[in-house]
């Protein structure tokens, strides 16, 4: 044996061996119980980073342990089409080539998307293979595979028929860069807030002299103001309720109204009410019957409804900068204060999210989610750490309907077709939609449209939220919807052999940031279509941060090069180092010293093995060290029991630290020294 452990050479040898021999392939074996782990499908745009390393190391750990214990272990890999992220990548790629998306047909753009996917989409899976992830690589699933696409469409139609999916107009989160709607869970906030300015504007009274001072962080939206609200209990303004003031710059009169939502302590205690551009203002507007005027285009520029020609076509943030001078010129700006503000940004593009009144497709979540709430709160599906149940409980008791439509082309196209009158027909295929249309025409004594060849219907241009496909992950990686029963609205699990054998899976490893985006919705979908839970346990990892507490990211320049570290410490050294410092749920402060400890540990095991291999084999019973053997055997069994107990209770870092102590101290420093020839 070589004196020094060559991690790079050994790991390469075994990862290639496992792939060539399909070591981790799993098929149904009724003589053994299954142990299944589903990989949280990384984005098709993704490359391996330290978050993936931690997550996949834990999954690999669980799956190899199960395999050693005799389970039929199956780790299912796959990738997500990642609608917003992928479309943004392709749009950027085309921009570099001088091509605009708007100049392409839908089919032409999708050809570019598939071309990009084929070229770059498998990178992260290839990287996982390289580092020896023990997946069944014959089971790779992509969320735009034909069978998966059909399943997503089938679920949309089914939920529409059951009354859970509807189309409605309400305030949504709008990404001006991607020009698409976002769910609340796709909006992120800087923990420390962001620097902003509070503008104190003068709204002059229509009757008499003087003005009302109103504080706002968004002066560019004054053109959509419909009222100024004050708290009905605020003695300063009671006498003004019902009077009118003028919007600066356009001199449009609006009323002063009373609403208990207004915070008397913020700013001046007066709130400009802009129903089209703020969710709280929208709700105030609904209570008071205010008009809703949207002054922003989809790209975040001001439109002609702002009634101020100089700003039409300009970006919202440019207007915010320029409006300050305009307000000063007419003496309508009292002062500006620097503040720290909570600003929502798109998780995918980092664009500041714009509240926008929009017609979108929604899922009614209140009734659909009841079973999921019950099974988590009763620990039928267990959360680790358990304190995440508190967050789950709060979110579920305040659950809102899910906006599932996205103004994109890459993804699962919404299966709704519109006639010339704006009526829509939902079906799994265009043929089904045309059958409904023909029935409608017949019922209204109108002539036949001539079927699909007549071309009278047009399909909805939008696609579904990415999560509206990935919530079916535990079902469709096993092709479950092939056995969907239209009469019952369920999957016939008894006919789906893989689903019946592998579901529920044993554990899923993920971050708490997608508890609602993904974990909760998978539980909802599984009970809706199989009456089974998707997994027994959910193991929430923490976020990998630097020593300053910042999340590791390329943008901050604080994310080390993974492959340089693999060359330096070996993949097993990194796995041990990362898992040993990651108590369940707690964020991890990345320190290269932990990887060094992992590398030294693998070297220690190698050297111990080299030492034993150098000894001569002696026939017969060794009575000289019998007491030592008895002592060590008892110690070994005690440590094995403790190790397994820690793992079963998901105390992974404790298990690894105890293992380290046992190998380094008990085995190497004592036992081997005591029995060596």
Question: PLM features: residue spans?
Answer:
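Short, solvent-exposed turn/loop segments enriched in Gly/Ser/Thr/Pro and often Arg
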Residues: 31-32, 40-41, 76-87, 140-148, ...
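Protease-associated
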Residues: 208-273, 279-283
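Non-catalytic terminal extensions that flank enzyme cores
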Residues: 1-50, 73, 347, 605
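N-terminal catalytic cores of NTP/NDP-binding nucleotidyl/phosphoryl-transfer enzymes
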Residues: 27-90, 152, 215-217, 257-284, ...
């Amino acid at each position: 044996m070589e004196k020094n452990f060559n991690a790079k050479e050994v790991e390469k040898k075994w990862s290639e061996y496992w792939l060539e021999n399909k070591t981790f392939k799993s098929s149904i074996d009724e003589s053994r119980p299954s142990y299944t782990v589903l990989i949280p499908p990384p984005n098709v745009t993704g490359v391996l980073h330290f978050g993936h390393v931690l997550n996949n190391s834990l999954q690999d750990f669980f799956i190899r342990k199960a395999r050693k214990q005799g389970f039929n272990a199956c780790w299912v890999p796959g990738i997500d089409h990642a609608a917003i992220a992928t479309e943004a990548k392709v749009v950027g790629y085309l921009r570099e080539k001088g091509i605009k998306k708007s100049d392409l047909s839908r089919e032409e753009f999708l050809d570019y998307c598939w071309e990009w996917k084929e070229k770059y989409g498998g990178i992260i899976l290839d990287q996982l293979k390289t580092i020896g992830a023990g997946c069944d690589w014959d089971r790779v699933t992509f969320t735009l595979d034909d069978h998966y696409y059909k399943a997503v469409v089938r679920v949309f139609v089914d939920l529409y028929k059951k009354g859970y999916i509807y189309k409605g107009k309400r305030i949504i989160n709008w990404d001006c860069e991607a020009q698409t709607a976002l769910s609340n869970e796709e909006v992120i906030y800087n923990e420390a807030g962001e620097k902003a300015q509070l503008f104190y504007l003068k709204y002059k009274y229509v009757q008499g002299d003087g003005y009302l001072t109103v504080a706002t962080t968004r002066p560019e939206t004054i053109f959509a103001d419909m009222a100024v609200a004050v708290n009905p209990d605020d003695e300063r303004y009671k006498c003004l309720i019902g009077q009118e003031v003028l919007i600066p710059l356009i001199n449009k009169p609006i009323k002063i109204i009373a609403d208990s939502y207004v915070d008397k302590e913020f700013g001046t205690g007066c709130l400009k009410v802009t129903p089209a551009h703020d969710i709280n203002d929208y709700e105030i507007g609904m209570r008071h019957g205010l008009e809703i005027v949207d002054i922003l285009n989809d790209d975040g520029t001001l439109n002609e409804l702002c009634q101020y020609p100089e700003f039409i076509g300009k970006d919202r943030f440019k207007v915010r900068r320029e409006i300050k001078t305009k307000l000063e010129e007419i003496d309508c700006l009292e002062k500006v204060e620097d503040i720290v503000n909570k600003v929502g940004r798109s998780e995918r593009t980092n664009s500041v999210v714009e509240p926008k009144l929009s017609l979108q497709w929604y899922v009614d979540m209140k009734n659909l989610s009841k079973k999921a709430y019950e099974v988590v709160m009763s620990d039928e599906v267990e959360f680790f750490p358990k304190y995440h149940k508190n967050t789950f409980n709060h979110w579920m008791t305040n659950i809102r309907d899910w906006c599932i439509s996205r103004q994109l082309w890459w993804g699962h196209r919404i299966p709704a077709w519109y006639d010339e009158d704006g009526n829509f027909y939902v079906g799994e295929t265009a043929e089904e939609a045309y059958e409904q249309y023909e029935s409608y025409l017949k019922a209204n004594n109108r002539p036949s449209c001539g079927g699909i060849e007549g071309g009278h219907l047009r399909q909805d241009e939008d696609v579904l939220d990415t999560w509206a496909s990935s919530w079916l992950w535990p079902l469709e990686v096993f092709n479950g919807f092939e056995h969907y029963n239209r009469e019952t609205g369920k999957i016939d699990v008894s006919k789906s052999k893989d689903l019946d054998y592998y579901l529920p899976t044993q554990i899923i490893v993920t971050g708490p940031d997608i508890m609602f985006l993904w974990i909760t919705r998978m539980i909802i979908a599984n009970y809706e279509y199989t009456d089974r839970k998707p997994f027994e346990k959910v193991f929430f990892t923490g976020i990998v941060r630097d020593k300053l507490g910042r999340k590791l990211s390329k943008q901050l320049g604080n994310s080390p090069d993974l492959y340089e570290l693999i060359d330096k410490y070996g993949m097993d050294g990194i796995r041990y180092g990362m898992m040993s410092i990651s108590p369940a749920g707690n964020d991890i402060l990345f320190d290269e010293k932990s990887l060094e400890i992992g590398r030294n540990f693998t070297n220690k095991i190698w050297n111990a093995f080299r030492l034993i291999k150098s000894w001569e084999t002696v026939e017969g019973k060794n009575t000289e060290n019998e007491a030592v053997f008895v002592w060590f055997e008892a110690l070994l069994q005690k440590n094995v029991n403790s190790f397994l107990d820690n793992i079963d209770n998901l105390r992974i870092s404790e298990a690894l630290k105890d293992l380290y102590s046992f190998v380094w101290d008990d085995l190497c420093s004592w036992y081997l020294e005591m029995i060596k020839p």
